[in-house]
Each structure stands twice: as structure tokens, then as C-alpha cells.
């Protein structure tokens, strides 16, 4: 999920999920 933060730039939804993963 943390990796989704970087890939989240492509998908807004994944970006939000990625940030939650970091937190």
C-alpha cells in the first residue's frame, strides 16, 4: 500500500489509499 502512494500520482484513489498506508 505504501508503494501505492508513488503510483497514486497516476490514480487519485490510489493516492489517497497510499497516504493512509503511510499513516
From Swiss-Prot:
Keywords: Secreted. One of its GO terms (cellular component) is extracellular region. It is found in: Secreted. Its main location: secreted. Expressed in skin granular glands. It comes from the Eukaryota. Belongs to the Frog skin active peptide (FSAP) family. Septenin subfamily. May act as an antimicrobial peptide. This is Septenin 2c.
Amino acid at each position: 500500500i505504501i508503494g501505492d502512494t508513488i503510483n497514486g500520482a497516476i490514480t487519485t484513489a490510489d493516492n489517497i489509499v497510499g497516504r493512509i498506508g503511510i499513516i
